[in-house]
Regions:
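Transmembrane helix-loop-helix hairpins at the membrane interface
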Residues: 8-22, 115-132, 139-245
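Short, solvent-exposed coil/turn linker segments
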Residues: 19, 48-49, 92
Length: 245
C-alpha cells in the first residue's frame, strides 16, 4: 500500500527531527519554526516520487491527488495531527497565531474570493488545453476527500507561513501587516524551490504560482487572520486538483 511506503519513507527524517527538537530548549521558537518548515517540505516532497500526487509535465503546471479516498483521508488527518502537535510542543509559536481578525463573515468571504483570484490565471490558460493533457478527469466521489486534504493539508502549510512566520514578523520584528504578508509569500515561494527543480521538472511555473498564491494568502491574513488565508490557499488547491477547471 502506497501510504505504508510513504510512512516508512518518512521515519528516518522524523526520528532525526524529534531528536533535534528534544535537544532544543523550548525557548528557541525560531529554531522550532525552521525545524517545522523543514519537516513540512520533506513530508510534502516525499509524496511526489510515490505518486501520492502529480504536479504538471514539463513546464506546464497542473495538480492531481491520488484517486484513493482512504489515502487522502489518512494524509488529511496526518496534517491535522502535525498542526495539533506543533501547537502543543511550541507554545511560543502557538501564541503568534491569530485565527480570525475583524469581521469573520467578511473574512470567510474574502478567503473564498482569494481562492478564485489565485486560480484565475491558470483557469484562463487551461481554457486552451484539453483536460486529458492536464491531469484528466477526477471521479465525483473523490471530491469530498480532495476538499478535506486540500483544507487540512493547507492548514498545516498556512500555520507555518501565515501563522508562525507572519506572527513572528509582526510581533517580534515589528514589521507592518501588509509587508509581513508579502514577505511570508516570498518565503512560501522559496519553500517550493526543491519541488520545482529537483523533485519535478515543472520549474519556474511552480515558483511563480506559489509566489502569487502565497502573497494573496498573506494579504488575506494581514486583514482577516489565519482561517481566511487557509480558505484562500486550500480552496485554490481544491479547484486545481478537482478537475472542475
Amino acid at each position: 500500500m502506497l501510504i505504508t511506503e510513504y510512512l516508512l519513507l518518512l521515519i528516518p527524517g522524523l526520528v532525526l527531527a524529534t531528536i533535534l527538537f528534544l535537544l532544543l530548549r523550548r525557548t528557541h521558537p525560531l529554531l522550532h519554526l525552521f525545524l517545522f518548515i523543514t519537516v513540512f517540505i520533506f513530508t510534502r516532497d516525499a509524496m511526489t516520487p510515490l505518486g501520492l500526487w502529480s504536479i504538471g509535465n514539463g513546464s506546464f503546471l497542473w495538480i492531481r491527488f491520488i484517486h484513493d479516498p482512504v489515502t487522502l483521508l489518512i494524509l488529511g488527518l496526518s496534517s491535522l495531527g502535525f498542526v495539533f502537535l506543533m501547537q502543543s510542543i511550541s507554545p511560543e509559536l502557538a501564541v503568534l497565531v491569530e485565527w480570525f481578525e475583524g469581521n469573520r463573515v467578511a473574512g470567510i468571504l474574502t478567503g473564498i474570493a482569494g481562492a478564485v483570484i489565485a486560480v484565475l490565471p491558470l483557469a484562463l490558460i487551461y481554457r486552451g488545453v484539453p483536460l486529458e493533457n492536464r491531469g484528466g478527469t477526477v471521479p465525483l466521489r473523490l471530491l469530498p476527500f480532495i476538499l478535506f486534504i486540500a483544507l487540512s493539508g493547507n492548514l498545516y502549510e498556512e500555520i507555518l507561513f501565515r501563522g508562525y512566520l507572519y506572527g513572528w514578523l509582526t510581533e517580534r520584528e515589528r514589521i507592518k501587516p501588509v509587508p509581513a504578508g508579502l514577505i511570508s509569500g516570498l518565503f512560501f515561494s522559496f519553500g517550493h524551490v526543491f519541488l520545482a527543480f529537483n523533485v519535478t521538472d515543472v520549474g519556474i511555473s511552480i515558483l511563480v504560482f506559489a509566489l502569487w498564491e502565497g502573497c494573496l494568502a498573506g494579504l488575506v491574513r494581514s486583514r482577516f487572520g489565519l482561517i481566511p488565508a487557509v480558505l484562500t490557499h486550500g480552496l485554490a488547491v481544491f479547484l486545481l486538483t478537482s478537475g472542475l477547471l
